[in-house]
A protein has these predicted regions:
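Glycine-rich beta-to-alpha transition loops that act as phosphate-gripper elements at the mouths
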Residues: 123, 253-259, 306-315
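Surface-exposed amphipathic alpha-helices with a cationic face
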Residues: 210-211, 237-249, 294-301, 322
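Conserved, mostly hydrophobic/aromatic
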Residues: 129, 169, 173, 189, ...
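Active-site core of bacterial EAL-family cyclic-dinucleotide phosphodiesterase domains
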Residues: 95-154, 337-338
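Structural preference for beta-strand elements that scaffold enzyme active sites
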Residues: 117, 135, 186-188, 219-223, ...
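EAL-family c-di-GMP phosphodiesterase catalytic domain
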Residues: 1-90, 94-99, 130, 226-229, ...
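Catalytic-site-adjacent helices and loops of nucleotide signaling machinery
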Residues: 149, 158, 252-265, 318
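Catalytic core of bacterial c-di-GMP phosphodiesterases, primarily the EAL and HD-GYP domains
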Residues: 163-235
Length: 351
């Protein structure tokens, strides 16, 4: 991983350690010291930084909660971080972010050490019924550190760890794919555009892992995740360009839902467009949905964009999207996420 403050290693949160607090003005630092002493702590000041030990995780949480509550009305902007027994320092954080970061030590450990694995959901070629790729979906690595992926990413965003988690997840997916998939099988991997503030810098570690594990860049498809709002189209275009210059494919997810519009598809011109389940569900019984899908396919064809129907849960849906001219399909009817990839072809026998 890189050593920048956005996606570099962060200190683990142990049972004992030392907080480091600071404020821009001397008066603010005096208020921090007064608060800590009033609470029975033993702060020491070194230059502009105030050091105060904690002797349990519960004490650490109480200390930050109390400091935030007491100084909220003072107008003092407090920043803080901590060091552990290995004397690892993290960059200074706003107090509100620090509070979130230490609120779930297990989530912090999961992110910092990459304590997760990935399940794979098959994607089929509708013309040949062959499994052409797998989408990688984050899952807990063990029952010791359990989590729901959505909750983990929500915590990461609030704790200013989104870039760390996104980078860890990308690299882990690539490593996982190298162990389980043959060359020529596409690997669909999610990414958060806002976590990649400088594509040429932030993606170095990703491309390094691709090379180290002997993965063909053309087998990779990086897709914008469903929860990510597209605020800066030019930035996303720059990310797509960086991926494509390296030989990697890109995809726009959840077309037809929220910010992922057909106009956005035409503007970004990804290699793949993934149509949201809201347009696929019971499309066999909805002529309006079918017409929307037809128009979407026509506009994608102009730009040579391969179209994938997501969320196929019924045979009838599969038949309709195939008839309409979709290239690819994915969903529970085809195959559920699994820790081991499905066979090389899909059959409706027994379904």
């Amino acid at each position: 991983m890189t050593s920048c403050s956005k996606c570099g290693m962060i200190p683990s949160l142990e049972e004992t350690g030392t907080f480091l607090f600071t404020a821009a003005e001397a008066g603010g630092r005096d208020l921090i010291i007064k608060h800590l002493k009033d609470r029975g702590a033993e702060p020491e000041q070194e230059g502009r930084t105030i050091h105060v030990p904690f002797y349990s995780l519960e004490e650490a949480v109480r200390m930050v909660d109390g400091l935030e509550a007491d100084l909220k009305e003072s107008g003092v902007s407090v920043k803080g971080t901590w060091k552990n027994s290995a004397s690892v320092f993290g960059h200074m954080l706003d107090l509100a972010v620090l509070k979130v970061r230490i609120s779930k030590p297990s989530y912090l450990k999961i992110i910092n050490e990459g304590l997760f694995t990935h399940h794979m959901q098959p994607i089929i070629n509708l013309h040949s019924s062959e499994v052409m790729g797998q989408e990688f979906l984050m899952r807990p690595d063990s029952s010791t550190y359990s989590f729901y992926p959505g909750e983990l990413f929500d915590y990461a965003q609030k704790a200013d760890l989104q870039s760390v988690l996104d980078s860890q997840a990308r690299m882990s997916s690539i490593e996982h794919s190298a162990r389980h998939l043959d060359q020529g099988t596409k690997r669909f991997i999610n990414f958060l555009p806002s976590s990649i503030y400088d594509p040429n810098h932030c993606l170095k570690s990703t491309f390094k892992v691709v090379k180290e594990h002997g993965v063909d860049p053309s087998d990779l498809v990086f897709e914008v995740v469903e929860t990510e709002k597209i605020h800066n189209v030019a930035h996303l275009q720059n990310i797509f360009k960086t991926y494509q210059q390296y030989g990697v494919n890109v995809a726009l997810d959840d077309l037809g839902s929220g910010f992922a519009t057909v106009e956005m598809l035409e503007q970004l011109k990804p290699d793949y467009g993934k149509v949201d389940r809201s347009l696929i569900s019971y499309c066999d019984q909805d002529e309006e949905k079918q017409e929307k899908l037809k128009q979407m396919l026509k506009r994608a064809e102009i730009h040579n964009i391969k179209m994938l129907a997501e969320g196929i849960e019924r045979k009838e849906e599969l038949e309709v999207v195939k008839q309409l001219g979709f290239d690819l399909a994915q969903g529970y009817y085809i195959g559920r996420p699994s820790d081991y990839p499905m066979g090389k072809s899909f059959t409706t026998a027994g379904k």
